[in-house]
Amino acid sequence: MLHEQSVELLNKAVADELTAVHQYMYFHFQCDDQGYDLLAGLFKRSAIDEMLHIERIAERILFLGGDVELLANATVKKIHDVKMMLA
């Protein structure tokens, strides 16, 4: 029972991380399109960092005998204003 609860919580963490990956990549695309190359790169790097977090969490889920669920828990916020992205 404890492992099942742990896997459930870890899968929620995976969902949060996936949501962050999607958001950071959306910001990356928007900044890249607007010519903010440095900021675009920072958002892309942040997305990659989140993917590495997912990898570590997934390893723990598998170690506990669980199944990794790759489902984001929120939709991407469609923000085009760079200042709002940083708020």
Task: Annotate the PLM regions.
Residues 1-87:
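Iron-associated oxidoreductase/ferritin-like identity signal
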